[in-house]
A protein has these predicted regions:
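N-terminal glycine-rich FAD/FM-binding segment characteristic of electron-transfer flavoproteins
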Residues: 1-254
Length: 254
């Protein structure tokens, strides 16, 4: 079985700076694998047998130049890495991202696609579903467990009040939740071995992809201004204090 696990590179949260204008400055933010996609990579690694092949795939812009992240991905189980780097994909929204991934996936070849439930930045929860629609494949989201029985997959979906159990044949698309596993911490041997694994880098033209007319535009990302604390402390439980607390709450809600 050939498994492709797709991931996104996102800025390191602790390096993002909020400006006085309540916008976000990413200039000094290093790249990392989206936390939800670490679960997808781990799910692929746990599912695969010795006869299977795991490929990791991502599309994007300048963040893909980070060699440390490339080694991080390959140290977590995938046998090879595919990158589609193009300026048009720098800030691509879910539809364009999905179209680029689908084009690359068709070129690579696959049996099973595994995605995280969303990305660590936009968390749109759309890309895996859109890829399945573009490729006309069955898609199951909210996957909390995967078992393999020959060429059949037994999938669990943990819902609010139920756990669904679904039998599925490949090819298919799975979108896994963050509860499905605990991503591994790569060993030193795995990190050193990652440097010997193949990395395939393409441009948009290599997969016959071009940016479509946008149906939506990301105008900007702003941080809501923080509300100043009132520093009112009521330090007893007398009826008068309770009444005072109620009065403050009424003022705050009105």
């Amino acid at each position: 079985m050939k498994i492709i696990t797709c991931f996104k590179l996102v800025p390191e949260e602790q390096d993002i700076v909020v400006t006085p204008e309540y916008t976000l400055n990413f200039d000094n933010a290093d790249a990392k694998i989206s936390q939800f996609d670490l679960n997808a990579i781990e799910a692929a690694s746990q599912l695969a047998t010795d006869d299977d092949e795991i490929a990791a795939l991502t599309v994007g812009g300048s963040l893909l130049q980070n060699s440390k992240v490339r080694k991080d991905v390959l140290s977590r189980g995938p046998h090879s890495l595919y990158l589609v780097q193009d300026a048009q994909l720098e800030h691509a929204l879910p539809l364009d991202t999905a179209k680029a991934l689908a084009a690359a996936i068709e070129k690579i070849g696959f049996d099973l696609l595994i995605f995280g439930e969303g990305s660590g930045d936009l968390y749109a929860q759309q890309v895996g579903l859109l890829v399945g629609e573009i490729l006309q494949l069955p898609v199951i989201n909210a996957v909390s467990a995967i078992q393999r029985q020959g060429n059949t997959l037994v999938i669990e979906r943990t819902l609010e009040d139920d756990v669904e159990v679904i039998e599925l044949s490949v090819p298919a698309v799975l979108c896994v939740t963050s509860d499905i596993n605990v991503p591994r911490i790569p060993s030193m041997k795995a990190i050193l071995g990652a440097g010997k694994k193949p990395v395939n880098q393409w441009q948009a033209s290599d997969i016959d992809w071009s940016q479509s007319a946008p149906l939506a535009e990301l105008v900007g990302i702003r941080v809501p201004p923080q509300t100043e604390r009132k520093h009112i402390i009521i330090d007893n439980d007398s009826p008068e204090a309770v009444a005072e607390l109620a009065e403050h709450l009424k003022k705050a809600l009105n």
